[in-house]
């Protein structure tokens, strides 16, 4: 059952859900500003590959990386975690 949920991108793991939510927020903000991953990478100093992995919740981001991303997208850190 657990692997069936994982294949559908669902999980009972709150940490995995948080990573997905953060990644989704970053991707939505980036796209709403019409930025490519490459452009965001230049603004943050992070690699395109790492940014892509964060957006897809395949890699967790450090606080430092999240700060760079939030700053580049003109977001408050709280917004990455679902705060208004």
Regions found by a protein language model. Give the residues of each.
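A short, Lys/Arg-rich alpha-helix, primarily the initiator
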Residues: 6-32
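Residues that mark the N-terminal boundary/hinge immediately upstream of a DNA-recognition element
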Residues: 25, 36, 62-65, 76
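Short alpha-helical DNA-recognition segment
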Residues: 34-53
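Hydrophobic micro-packing sites on short alpha-helices
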Residues: 40, 65-73, 79-81
